[in-house]
């Protein structure tokens, strides 16, 4: 069990190095490998194949903390990588960012990435929700502010069109 945690940590660190080098596909591969090492160790998740094989000893609180930290970091880093790759898979960015936010609801980077994903998926209400939360945590971040402005603009445009549509229906 300790070995799997160490291997997962090593894969995560390799992924971080690949990310710094701009090798996003390689980084994604390393983060996925790290998560695979952790599969079945997380007591909060159901086992993929119940009642198969011996049940390992329970994780200590320290091991569980390490496991959750590695998982959260990997999901956050996966979202960052995917935003750098073409074509961007916004559904995955949203999914990974939300996994981070389940454990760390205040994580500014995950809030921002979720907002960006929802924006590009044209769910502007959700984008606004996440970007407002991100701007509250990082008020000086120009990217967060820019995406919040773009989202507000799209929402205003949508509401203007909606208003004109209803005026046309009842005129």
Swiss-Prot record:
Keyword Kinase included in the entry's annotation: no
Family membership: Belongs to the TTC9 family.
Gene name of the record: Ttc9c
InterPro entries found in the cross-reference section: AIP/AIPL1/TTC9 (IPR039663), TPR-like_helical_dom_sf (IPR011990), TPR_rpt (IPR019734)
Alphabetically ordered keywords of this record: Repeat, TPR repeat
Name this polypeptide is given: Tetratricopeptide repeat protein 9C
TPR repeats: 8-41, 72-107, 108-141
Record keyword Repeat present: yes
PROSITE patterns: TPR, TPR_REGION
Highest taxon in the source lineage: Eukaryota
A Pfam family: TPR_19
């Amino acid at each position: 069990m300790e070995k799997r945690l160490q291997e997962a940590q090593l894969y995560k660190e390799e992924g971080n190095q690949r990310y710094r080098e701009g090798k996003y596909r390689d980084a994604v591969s390393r983060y996925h490998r790290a998560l695979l090492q952790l599969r079945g160790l997380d007591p909060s998740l159901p086992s993929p194949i119940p009642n198969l094989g011996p049940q390992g000893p329970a994780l200590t609180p320290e091991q569980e903390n390490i496991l959750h930290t590695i998982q959260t970091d990997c999901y956050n880093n996966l979202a960052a990588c995917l935003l750098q790759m073409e074509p961007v898979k916004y559904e995955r960015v949203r999914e990974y960012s939300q996994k981070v936010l389940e454990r760390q609801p205040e994580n500014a980077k995950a809030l921002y990435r979720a907002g960006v994903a929802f924006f590009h998926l044209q769910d502007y209400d959700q984008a606004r929700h996440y970007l407002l939360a991100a701007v509250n945590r990082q008020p000086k971040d120009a990217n967060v502010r820019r995406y919040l402005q773009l989202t507000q603009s799209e929402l205003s445009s949508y509401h203007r069109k909606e208003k004109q549509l209803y005026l046309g229906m009842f005129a």
